[in-house]
């Protein structure tokens, strides 16, 4: 594995001996075999270039994956190999793929090799430092041993599925339930309340979605606080496999050199596993369970172990997870779950009620929802809220049959409190202000716990359900109820 800085060896040239799709065999002089993970460069002549201004030559990067004997390496191409022929000259760069790091990455979109994709024609960008994407995780004695909660100011997350500083969070949800808005809001809050930056890795998803995300982030004003790296579904499997490492390397620089708290988004972590399976098959490895690569756990671990808190600052990761055929025992999601500290599940049913963020409070989990980490008051409040919501869920079938009036007084009270809790779990977002016209709100965790404890204790039993909708903390609730009373009096 490479360290922060890697000195390039004397360049050595080889020649292509075999081309099979994106797998390339290259022969080098004996004694000059490139190291595993070294980046090789080869130029393809584009014989089909007929339009004026169309590139006549294309340089592609190969990454060394295997040594075959004393003089041949097997590589994976990061770009299409159309036009590559046997005998083509290949140069060894002497170092792994290296990417720009530092402030130059903010507000820019990169490919896996660190090339800027959204550079303006008149823009001059100076890259002063590059880091290799293959790096060791922090040493054991550099890790932060204390488990801390990462306060987001979002009530439903802080109360029921608290995030771990330097932890890994799985984000589940279908199309249209608010994943993108939640991602944008987290980027905004990290910059605003934690003074940190965000890095986004788009792995194997639709190019249109990536383009929409960039446009929406620019509109929301969070693009300048974010570095984005994309390897979408039309890219080579080698590219999709390395994009998370490129993004993570940029995040590590912010953490280790600039001492910032970083939020790393990976969308979608399943596509990373899928790309690893494709590369493994191309390299001729024997498949393992359900056709996945035999080194699935090792590949996942090499990525996830680098996402952590050091004694300086942290990288907190939010990873969108696709579960194939909703089978949670599939090796890909099952391997990912072993690394997660919390799961946030977005529900279409909750979104259909107009409650955002549409986090399912009963399905979402966190390993630090424990008195040892969040305190007894937080733990007790979360359990009481979940118990009320669970009882309300059980009563829905009965209510559908006989109506709410036939319930016992205790169950009626539970249902009324549950409805208020559901509404109060919603919250206005800063990035949605221009669409909703309602200002965003940040609610400290202590205030969240106090507010929900009061609801569970029945302090607000006389306050109508409508007063709990679209507000932030206790002060907002009491102000809205006061205004409603004035309107009713008028």
Swiss-Prot record:
Its main location: membrane. It is an enzyme of class 7 (translocase). This is ATP synthase subunit beta. PANTHER family: ATP SYNTHASE (PTHR15184), ATP SYNTHASE SUBUNIT BETA, MITOCHONDRIAL (PTHR15184:SF71). The keyword Metal-binding does not apply. Belongs to the ATPase alpha/beta chains family. It comes from Bifidobacterium longum subsp. infantis (strain ATCC 15697 / DSM 20088 / JCM 1222 / NCTC 11817 / S12). SMART domains: AAA. Pfam families: ATP-synt_ab, ATP-synt_ab_N, ATP-synt_VA_C. It catalyses: ATP + H2O + 4 H(+)(in) = ADP + phosphate + 5 H(+)(out). ATP binds at residues 173-180. F-type ATPases have 2 components, CF(1) - the catalytic core - and CF(0) - the membrane proton channel. CF(1) has five subunits: alpha(3), beta(3), gamma(1), delta(1), epsilon(1). CF(0) has three main subunits: a(1), b(2) and c(9-12). The alpha and beta chains form an alternating ring which encloses part of the gamma chain. CF(1) is attached to CF(0) by a central stalk formed by the gamma and epsilon chains, while a peripheral stalk is formed by the delta and b chains. It is a peripheral membrane protein. Its EC number is 7.1.2.2. GO terms for molecular function: ATP binding; ATP hydrolysis activity; proton-transporting ATP synthase activity, rotational mechanism. GO terms for cellular component: plasma membrane; proton-transporting ATP synthase complex. It is found in: Cell membrane. SUPFAM superfamilies: C-terminal domain of alpha and beta subunits of F1 ATP synthase, N-terminal domain of alpha and beta subunits of F1 ATP synthase, P-loop containing nucleoside triphosphate hydrolases. Keywords: ATP synthesis, ATP-binding, Cell membrane, CF(1), Hydrogen ion transport, Ion transport, Membrane, Nucleotide-binding, Translocase, Transport. InterPro entries: AAA+_ATPase (IPR003593), ATP-synt_VA_C (IPR055190), ATP_synth_F1_bsu (IPR005722), ATPase_alpha/beta_chains (IPR050053), ATPase_F1/V1/A1_a/bsu_N (IPR004100), ATPase_F1/V1/A1_a/bsu_N_sf (IPR036121), ATPase_F1/V1/A1_a/bsu_nucl-bd (IPR000194), ATPase_F1/V1_b/a_C (IPR024034). Produces ATP from ADP in the presence of a proton gradient across the membrane. The catalytic sites are hosted primarily by the beta subunits.
